[in-house]
UniProtKB/Swiss-Prot annotation:
EC number(s) recorded for this UniProt protein: 2.7.1.148
Gene3D superfamilies: 3.30.230.10, GHMP kinase, C-terminal domain
Catalyzed reactions: 4-CDP-2-C-methyl-D-erythritol + ATP = 4-CDP-2-C-methyl-D-erythritol 2-phosphate + ADP + H(+)
Family matches, as Pfam families: GHMP_kinases_C, GHMP_kinases_N
Name of the protein in question: 4-diphosphocytidyl-2-C-methyl-D-erythritol kinase
Residues forming the catalytic site: K16, D142
Pathway stated in the Swiss-Prot or TrEMBL entry: Isoprenoid biosynthesis; isopentenyl diphosphate biosynthesis via DXP pathway; isopentenyl diphosphate from 1-deoxy-D-xylulose 5-phosphate: step 3/6
Annotated ATP binding sites: P100, I101, G102, A103, G104, L105, A106, G107, G108, S109, S110
Swiss-Prot/TrEMBL keywords: ATP-binding, Isoprene biosynthesis, Kinase, Nucleotide-binding, Transferase
Amino acid sequence: MQDFAKKKINIKSPAKINLHLEVIGKREDGFHELAMIMQNIDLADYLEFEINNEGLIKLESDCNDLSLSDDNLIVKSANLLRKKSNIDYGANIFLRKNIPIGAGLAGGSSNAAATLIGLNNLWDLKLDQETLCSLASTLGSDIPFFINGGIQLCFGRGEILEKLDSTLEYGAILLKNPNVSVSTAETYKKYSNRFCDQYLTDREMIENIRKNLRDNGLNNLNFDNQHLSIKNDLQLVVENENDSVKQALYLLSKLENCLTFSMSGSGPTCFALFKDKETAKKELTANSKLFKDKGYDSWVCTFLEKGITFI
């Protein structure tokens, strides 16, 4: 067995926000048919990978609230890659956690993708991006997005990706109550109970929605056109049932230089966009005490052109 014991890799694993989330219908496999725009932001976790020759995946973290066992997506990703590649050695992995858990920012999915990318390099497997995306899709619907990163159209259950040729430079303020989490599965179930009569099954109609997002999605996010809007269908469910989300959206809507605001994913994190990161920083400085007094953690972020990166 080749001795790679001293080889280490460090990776930045960024969060995402949804700039568009449209629930179109229900697929035969039980997943929902979606049309989304996802964007990486610079709120990120950091992972360190080191080869071990014991054939074991050992995960440690500075986050006490995180399971480090086989149900963790990092461990699942590593074991899947080992099985796929039929290798004998393992890895020691350390996760420095900054992205809040259960927040609608897909920190776990980002970590899973970072693990596939990192171990592909560490173990010198030379798997191409298409293969990594295929593996990622078996682990979770939005993990393939993180293999590619940046800003992307995401269709199907989230695994069908189309790169958007654009660089958005907005700043963002994120708010999340640290004591509140939202179950993604429960949110989709509640949405389906309320709106299943509006679901589409006709493939041509579904493709028309995809085409409309391709043609107009960026225009809706272009401040120069003074037409900045964000759609999140799941917000219709979560906002009505979660006072923390409702209050966060209200607080963000009242910020002086806010361009638009929304919930990310299935929540409960909410965000407001500003013309640049500096403007967002000033707004957070002016309102940080208010946010804290209302029970929210807050972050200032900007958009990333790329997703997971080696550091």
